[in-house]
Amino acid sequence: MQITKPALLVSSLLIACAATDTAAQEKPRTQPAYNYANVSFADYDGGDALTIAGGVEFNSPYFVSGHYKTIDSNAISASRDSVGFNLGRYFWLNSGLIADVQARVGRVDFGPLDSNYWGAEANLRQRVDQFEFYGGVGYLNYTDAGSDNIYQFGVNYFLNQNTSVGVGYQDSEYGDGVRLRASYHF
């Protein structure tokens, strides 16, 4: 997998922020973390992926998020890129339990075939001390490649108020995979 200069820059910034925040040892965050920047690495059936993502809450409880993903694909012997944007709303359900719904649009490069996509996603997040457990379902419709149902779950561990690391699992009709993530929350 080829790592691009923007990926290295964002990764370096996240590591620097994580080191600064770890030294501060602040109290864990207890509110939802929709303001974030993260980098993740995933091992999927069809290859490996590096993702740079971020989100901003712009008018509570609404948020926008986006990602750039590069996938080194074994299935098509090529690299694939994906760019996507989400617009969502979250709902406080109970102490530490939050639901969110999101509309998604984007574009993915399937090697020789490019396709736009649209879809929806719904997630539940439960905060317990420094752990945040999540699970969700999603649907994507690719204009040139059919549709996909997505199921995911995982856990994030907050090292301090602004830094978390996590592991997640995602299953879809195009394959499944495990994702490792480091996030900075602001």
Map each language-model feature to its residues.
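Cleavable N-terminal export/targeting peptides
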Residues: M1-A33
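Short glycine/proline- and aromatic-enriched beta-strand/turn motifs that initiate or cap beta-hairpins
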Residues: T20-D72, V105
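Transmembrane beta-strands of outer-membrane beta-barrel proteins
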Residues: Y36-A42, G55, S65-K69, D100-G106, ...
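Solvent-exposed loop/turn segments connecting transmembrane beta-strands
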Residues: S40-L50, I71-D81, S95, R107-W118, ...
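Residue-level signature of outer-membrane beta-barrel architecture
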Residues: V56-F58, R89-F91, V105, L124-Q126, ...
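Repeated loop/turn-to-beta-strand initiation elements of outer-membrane beta-barrel proteins
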Residues: S60-G66, W92-A99, V128-G135, Y157-V167
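Outer-membrane beta-barrel "beta-signal"
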Residues: F85, F153-Y157, G175-F186
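Surface-exposed, polar helix/loop patches in the mature regions of secreted/periplasmic/lumenal proteins
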Residues: D100-Y134
